[in-house]
């Protein structure tokens, strides 16, 4: 049996997000889906997995709410179910930047994955990776600036220190698009004018371009039991245990915390 992993988000005002939780959870359970959906007043953010027909059903169910008809939606395949349960959670933010009253509608301009390579090759463009340090270690775009943050909520402090460059053209990216979209809104609030971000993130870029120009270097960390994927969107075979340094497959995985992987031999309990 194969599974479809769907990752999606949308920044939109959901004033009744408290009331949406039970209905969405019931639909996911009915379709036998696993994963996590986050709801907040600022929108929805999720990664779920299930059979093809079930994913189609939840997509149609969510899009029946006019506020969710423009979901940023990406899919990949897995040979096993990467999640153990289905969770729908209420949050203050769907991605934790820690900035109150940020108007996410004032985000930067999208760059389509097919045009990303040409755009970032321009000499006056600074490329910024908005992900955490342990993610950047696995892979990044060539010449991208690494803010060396441990948590996304540390990004605002770094951005303020970078504000002397506010007259430059900035291109930002993340895994699936949500962090770079929110961070562009924050950069614009600091006075950056020429701000852009990769539509759909690294995952859409790899899916659309197959990394034909080799601008993506390394693996891409993902937040499920696959741990990381390669440029072909297949589970990576280059993840190593932090204790024995042996490569770790999904079957051998014992635990993972913020990119720190432990194999079953080193943690048999």
From Swiss-Prot:
<dbReference type="InterPro" id="IPR020936">
    <property type="entry name" value="TrhO"/>
</dbReference>
<dbReference type="GO" id="GO:0006400">
    <property type="term" value="P:tRNA modification"/>
</dbReference>
<feature type="active site" description="Cysteine persulfide intermediate">
    <location>
        <position position="174"/>
    </location>
</feature>
<dbReference type="GO" id="GO:0016705">
    <property type="term" value="F:oxidoreductase activity, acting on paired donors, with incorporation or reduction of molecular oxygen"/>
</dbReference>
<dbReference type="Pfam" id="PF17773">
    <property type="entry name" value="UPF0176_N"/>
</dbReference>
<dbReference type="InterPro" id="IPR001763">
    <property type="entry name" value="Rhodanese-like_dom"/>
</dbReference>
<comment type="similarity">
    <text>Belongs to the TrhO family.</text>
</comment>
<dbReference type="InterPro" id="IPR040503">
    <property type="entry name" value="TRHO_N"/>
</dbReference>
<keyword id="KW-0819">tRNA processing</keyword>
<comment type="function">
    <text>Catalyzes oxygen-dependent 5-hydroxyuridine (ho5U) modification at position 34 in tRNAs.</text>
</comment>
<dbReference type="Pfam" id="PF00581">
    <property type="entry name" value="Rhodanese"/>
</dbReference>
<feature type="domain" description="Rhodanese">
    <location>
        <begin position="121"/>
        <end position="214"/>
    </location>
</feature>
<keyword id="KW-0560">Oxidoreductase</keyword>
<protein>
    <recommendedName>
        <fullName>tRNA uridine(34) hydroxylase</fullName>
        <ecNumber>1.14.-.-</ecNumber>
    </recommendedName>
</protein>
<dbReference type="InterPro" id="IPR036873">
    <property type="entry name" value="Rhodanese-like_dom_sf"/>
</dbReference>
């Amino acid at each position: 049996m194969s599974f479809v992993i769907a990752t999606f988000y949308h920044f939109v005002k959901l004033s009744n997000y408290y009331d949406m939780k039970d209905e969405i959870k019931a639909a996911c359970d009915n379709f036998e889906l696993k994963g996590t959906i986050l709801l907040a007043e600022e929108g929805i953010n999720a990664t779920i997995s299930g059979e093809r027909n079930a994913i189609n059903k939840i997509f149609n169910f969510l899009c029946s709410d006019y506020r969710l008809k423009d979901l940023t939606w990406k899919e990949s395949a897995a040979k096993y179910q990467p999640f153990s349960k289905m969770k729908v959670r209420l949050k203050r933010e769907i991605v934790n930047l820690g900035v109150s009253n940020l108007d996410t509608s004032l985000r930067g301009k999208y760059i389509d994955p097919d045009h990303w390579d040409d755009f970032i090759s321009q000499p006056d463009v600074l490329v910024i990776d908005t992900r955490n340090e342990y993610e950047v270690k696995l892979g990044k775009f060539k010449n991208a600036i690494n803010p060396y943050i441990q948590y996304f909520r540390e990004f605002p402090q770094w951005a303020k220190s970078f504000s002397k460059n506010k007259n430059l053209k900035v291109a930002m990216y993340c895994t699936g698009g949500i962090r770079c979209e929110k961070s562009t809104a924050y950069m614009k609030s600091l006075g950056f004018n020429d701000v852009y971000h990769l539509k759909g993130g690294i995952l859409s870029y790899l899916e659309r371009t197959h990394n034909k120009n080799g601008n993506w270097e390394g693996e891409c960390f993902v937040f499920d039991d696959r741990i990381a994927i390669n440029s072909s969107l297949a589970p990576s075979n280059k993840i190593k245990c932090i204790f024995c340094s042996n490569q770790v497959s999904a079957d051998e995985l014992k635990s993972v915390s913020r990119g720190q992987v432990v194999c079953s031999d080193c943690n048999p309990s």
